[in-house]
Amino acid sequence: VIFAEEVPEKHSLEIFSALKSKKSFIVGPSSIGLLIPKVLKLGAIGGTEGRQLVQSKLLEPGDVAVFSSSGGMTNEIIRTVIGQGRRLSFALSFGGERFPIFSPTEAFLAAEDDPKTKTIVYFGELGGTDEYELADLISKKKIKKEVICYIAGIVADMFESPPQFGHAKALAKTDVETAVAKKKVLKDAGAKVADSFSEFVEMIGNSNGKVVEDNEEYSIIQQDMTDRKKALIASSISGDIDGEPQILGENLLSFAKDHSFAYISASLFLGRKIQSQRLEKCVDFILRQLVDHGPYVSGAVN
């Protein structure tokens, strides 16, 4: 799995060409990872903390395959599948680059060949033409298993010129690359295509396969840390008093509740509480200008 972002397209194509003659594959670039429950976990897919791994039921193999270009949405859909009483057969994120080395077509064919997989859950977005290849596979019965899809980016049709979403590929330069066109071609091919994210969740809940009762509990083994030495770093910004986290001499929760985000950001940056309201307003103005107000994010569901 290649986790790195901004890998030159030339390098990706070279890797793709080199792998053609070998019985191996690479997921990425810009991928969050590859996951096969109870067998393999590469990357942050499914979570990084013990609590997240337990909640994602990674020790319980199932029959639902999850695919998406978006790393964040891959994890979100994994949790959605689990929340609907289903379990994963495997999951992966292609990465948001224009030329992922392991394509959605290859992933769908792998799921079709996997005897454990009964349902394929796919989160796509505007840009590119991968969905047309997927629709062709479905219509030609090369993919016979249940396919549930959501295609993000319909909001792009509201703009006079096509907006660039967060991923390099997420730009509909032509009509065939729009989310509306992709939804239609997949639906016409026989896939189940949701018109809203809530409908997408409902489709997953009603999908084929086994529903698992959430009864089994797993204990997370905590490593014995009694041999750890105290840190030799003294901080005047953060600390704790009787187990309560402190920021600049004030309780963390109270500090976050009583002050604006601009005040907190400026104070932490300077290492002391700011006194100037003009500075606070200036920082607030800068943050408002920099924040992403529009739909230009990967996997936008609005």
Summary of predicted features, one role per range:
Residues 1-254, 260, 268, 272-302:
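Catalytic-core regions of core metabolic enzymes
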